[in-house]
């Protein structure tokens, strides 16, 4: 008998040479994973997955303060509440920074505990304790454990999903009330944490039919009855009330792109699993032997198909990228399936060869660099690791290295099927997972630190530090939602959001558009506003500027804030957009009288640009300055549009601008000029 064919049946764990018991070794795996993820979280100083991380935290704050789930005062019909419930005590007892760090620590514990059900699953399939330990280590070595640093539902749902799969196999193997109830509880918790895992009950029902066929109503009467109750309730309530925040899933389009993304997801998931184990694992799942293996195969196949459908449906409806967040719970099943393949004596050599050849051909034809570019890696820690490699060795070299590794892994799968060496394939896969996890963690930490530097001051809770409360975040036209969400995340005193003009909201929750009266009074905001100055210059007639940070300024008034001046299209660094408008509102008399002054210029090396302000045209050349003065005498608001007629200048951050302008200085007739503090 080949050595690796007997490998899963070895009585003592091959990794426990020093006499440690398997349970002690499993404990070490869990603790080591927790320690590593805790250290990695320390290097992840700010959330960056928006708006999800903010929404979970906002709901946790509402729960922690004794309120119903809500975001900025608006009721949140959010079905995935387990993560906010677990984080609520931290939000109730501690400040934003410590609550954030404690949530990360909690996530590190939960994700590391996923090793336990994976370890328990393998021996049930007659795999050795040592092999089970390798499977458990793989479950916490995958790059997706980087999500422990995020305030998302994934870290919470992952261990419950793995536990539900292990309990489901046990309940299908020997239908007993205790194990059936355990499966229902774990599947319910996984779904309560992340709605995508609603496929778990469906997978259990399908696997039960596969295992027991006509006897299923007798053997699985209790779980079938209990699972039918929420289905009846969901039908009665309707999808909008059941799915809440996710109700739009019923309106997603099903078309040809669905099949395309299903294929892409399968290919990239196989790559993320290391390729070498995948063909053998698929053969074992396709050819189960006995009741227990049939239960595992049926549960895994339907569970995987459901997640794949969800991921492909989401990607084919606008989110065109690899949805690894939906799929990574399938990765720990690969080494388990491969163990069955070894136990069976490595059958299906032809099938393994064909699958290996197909994976290699796809890897050669589809460079991963195309999927890891730009936003393609947003939901994929594996592609973050790929991008990190390409950043070090170059895109072309990185693609070549990955194609060579894919070829070697595919060849390894064929070699194992014919000559053995399964333990080396498992060891290589585990090593590859650790290496990819390290690269993903380094890349993620760098991105999170960059977000912290770009969007936040040293004290991220700077608005709270002023002592002001019930602050309204005022989003202006052209302002990026991401920077605004960071302020919402770290400052509990920001209680509302409002939109000025055609500004973009940060999320789907309460963000009414501000109405501006003829005298400039804004309705729909409180007396304290946090203004996003990224693409607008604002001054108020009756409010004082309390503090500034980056592109934000905090203003406080004794009554409703009244606008004095707004220049839409002037960026915080002084560049003007290709078009915009300058508006001045009247004084108490109802008239707008005085002068507005600003200076136009271009730095050396910029392209000469022609810009119009109203009917006047100004030709601006690099190194020159042109001072513009307008005398105003109008009843009600006065507005001056501007637009670029020739030239323009592209910025490194992809903004297409025209010329630079100093902040407009308004000098009202009979009053001293009010000069802005900014000089950009």
What are these language model-derived features?
Residues 10, 502-680:
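C-terminal luminal/periplasmic domains and tails of membrane-associated envelope-modifying transferases
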Residues 12, 16, 31, 267-297, ...:
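Hydrophobic, aromatic-rich transmembrane alpha-helices
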Residues 22-49, 140-141, 190, 228-239, ...:
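Transmembrane signal-anchor helices characteristic of membrane glycosylation enzymes that use polyprenol
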Residues 36, 197, 201, 206-288, ...:
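Membrane-lumen/periplasm interface segments of specific transmembrane helices
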Residues 42-54, 65-88, 101:
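Membrane-proximal lumenal/periplasmic loop motifs of glycosylation machinery
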Residues 76, 149-157:
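Short acidic/glycine- and proline-prone juxtamembrane loop motifs at membrane-interface regions
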Residues 105-125, 163:
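Transmembrane-helix motifs of polytopic, lipid-linked glycan transferases
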Residues 123-126, 164-180, 208:
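Membrane-interface transmembrane helices that cradle and orient dolichyl/undecaprenyl
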């Amino acid at each position: 008998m080949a050595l690796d064919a007997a490998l899963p049946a070895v009585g003592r764990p091959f990794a426990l040479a020093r006499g440690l018991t398997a349970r002690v070794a499993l404990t070490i795996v869990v603790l080591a994973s927790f320690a590593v993820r805790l250290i990695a979280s320390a290097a992840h100083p700010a959330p960056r997955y928006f708006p999800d991380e903010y929404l979970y935290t906002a709901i946790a704050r509402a729960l922690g303060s004794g309120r119903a789930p809500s975001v900025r005062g608006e009721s949140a019909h959010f079905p995935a509440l387990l993560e906010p419930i677990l984080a609520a005590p931290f939000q109730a007892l501690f400040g934003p920074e410590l609550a954030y760090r404690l949530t990360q620590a909690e996530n590190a514990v939960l994700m590391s505990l996923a090793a336990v059900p994976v370890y328990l699953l393998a021996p049930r399939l007659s795999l050795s304790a040592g092999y089970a330990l390798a499977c458990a280590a793989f479950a916490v070595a995958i790059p997706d454990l980087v999500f422990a640093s995020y305030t998302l539902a994934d870290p919470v749902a992952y261990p419950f999903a793995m536990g539900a799969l292990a309990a489901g196999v046990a309940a299908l193997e020997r239908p007993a009330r205790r194990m059936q109830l355990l499966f229902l509880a774990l599947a319910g918790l996984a779904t309560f944490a992340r709605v995508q895992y609603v496929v778990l009950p469906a997978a259990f029902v399908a696997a039960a039919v596969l295992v027991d066929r006509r006897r299923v109503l007798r053997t699985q009467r209790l779980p079938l009855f209990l699972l039918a109750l929420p289905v009846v309730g969901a039908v009665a309530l309707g999808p909008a009330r059941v799915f809440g925040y996710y109700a739009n899933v019923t309106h997603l389009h099903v078309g040809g792109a669905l099949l395309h993304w299903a294929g892409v997801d399968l290919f990239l998931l196989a790559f993320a699993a290391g390729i070498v184990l995948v063909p053998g694992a698929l053969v074992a799942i396709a050819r189960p032997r006995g009741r227990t293996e049939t239960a595992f195969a049926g549960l895994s196949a339907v569970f995987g198909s459901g997640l794949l459908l969800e991921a492909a449906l989401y990607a084919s409806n606008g989110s065109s990228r690899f949805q690894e967040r939906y799929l990574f719970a399938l990765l720990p099943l690969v080494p388990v399936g491969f163990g069955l393949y070894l136990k069976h004596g490595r059958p299906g050599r032809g099938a393994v060869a064909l699958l290996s050849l197909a994976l290699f051909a796809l890897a050669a034809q589809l460079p991963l660099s195309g999927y890891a570019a730009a936003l393609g890696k947003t939901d994929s820690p594996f592609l973050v690791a790929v991008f990190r490699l390409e950043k070090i060795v170059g895109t072309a070299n990185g693609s070549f290295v990955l194609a060579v590794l894919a070829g070697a892994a595919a060849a390894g799968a064929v070699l194992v099927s014919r000559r053995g060496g399964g333990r080396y394939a498992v060891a290589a896969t585990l090593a590859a997972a650790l290496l990819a996890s390290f690269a993903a963690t380094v890349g993620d930490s760098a991105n999170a630190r960059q977000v912290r530097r770009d969007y936040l001051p040293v004290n991220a809770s700077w608005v709270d530090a002023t002592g002001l409360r019930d602050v309204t975040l005022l989003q202006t036209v052209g302002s990026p939602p991401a920077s605004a969400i960071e302020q919402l995340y770290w400052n509990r005193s920001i209680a509302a959001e409002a939109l000025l003009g055609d500004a973009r909201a940060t999320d789907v929750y309460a963000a009414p558009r501000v109405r501006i009266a003829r005298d400039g009074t804004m309705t729909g905001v409180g007396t304290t506003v946090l203004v996003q100055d990224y693409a607008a210059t604002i001054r108020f007639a009756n409010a004082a500027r309390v503090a500034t940070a980056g592109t934000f300024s905090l203003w406080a008034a004794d009554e409703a804030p009244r606008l004095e001046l707004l220049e839409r299209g002037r960026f915080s660094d002084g560049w003007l957009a290709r078009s915009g408008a300058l508006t001045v509102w009247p004084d108490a008399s109802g008239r707008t009288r005085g002068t507005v002054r600003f200076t136009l210029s271009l730095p050396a090396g910029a392209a000469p640009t022609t810009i119009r302000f109203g009917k006047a045209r100004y030709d601006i050349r690099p190194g020159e300055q042109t001072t513009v003065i307008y005398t105003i005498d109008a009843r009600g608001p006065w507005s001056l549009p501007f637009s670029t007629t020739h030239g323009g200048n592209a910025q490194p951050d992809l903004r297409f601008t025209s010329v630079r302008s100093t902040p407009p200085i308004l000098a009202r007739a009979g009053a001293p000029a009010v000069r802005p503090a900014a000089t950009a």
